[in-house]
Amino acid sequence: MMTQDYKLQVEAIKCGTVIDHIPAQIGFKLLSLFKLTATDQRITIGLNLPSKRSGRKDLIKIENTFLTEQQANQLAMYAPDATVNRIDNYEVVKKLTLSLPERIDAVLTCPNSNCISHNEPVDSSFTVKAQRGEISLKCKYCEKEFDHLAVLHAD
């Protein structure tokens, strides 16, 4: 007879947000890109955790903080299959269904080094386009279009 030992690899939180099923190697980037660390609340990160769905995944838990639907939808660009769960008293009280936003403002950096958004005191602004499973972003200022991964790695 075989026994299975199930153990949480990342400690449960009493109240807050759990972002699960983030593609492996993306969790850290999401933390900085979306300024999820701009809090004094405890943040627990699991990187390269085993996942039945995708082999490996990242996980982020932020205590006493709830993401808005807009914030959660911005994550969909880089973690389309992620789940964003609201936790209260150690229970999932709400699951946010992610959908791509039409725009993303003041989060990403334009990869075009000649774009005025680098030198002027303006917030970045991108229109999100999805076609045949490919996601691209069009900068409001230089009007150039980029693959979403190019924008992810632009710093």
From Swiss-Prot:
Question: A Gene Ontology biological process annotation?
Answer: pyrimidine nucleotide biosynthetic process
**Cofactor(s) the protein requires to work:** Zn(2+)
Q: Where does Zn(2+) bind?
A: 110, 115, 139, 142
Per the record, its GO cellular-component terms are: aspartate carbamoyltransferase complex
Asked if Zinc is a keyword of the record, the answer is yes
- Keywords from the UniProt entry: Metal-binding, Pyrimidine biosynthesis, Zinc
Q: Cofactor comment in the record?
A: Binds 1 zinc ion per subunit.
| MF annotations from Gene Ontology | metal ion binding
InterPro entries on file: Asp_carbamoyltransf_reg_N, Asp_carbamoylTrfase_reg, Asp_carbamoyltrfase_reg_C, Asp_carbatrfase_reg_C_sf, Asp_carbatrfase_reg_N_sf
| Family, as annotated | Belongs to the PyrI family.
Q: What does this protein do?
A: Involved in allosteric regulation of aspartate carbamoyltransferase.
The annotated subunit structure for this chain is: Contains catalytic and regulatory chains.
The name under which this protein is listed is Aspartate carbamoyltransferase regulatory chain
Lineage summary: Bacteria, Pseudomonadati, Pseudomonadota, Gammaproteobacteria, Enterobacterales
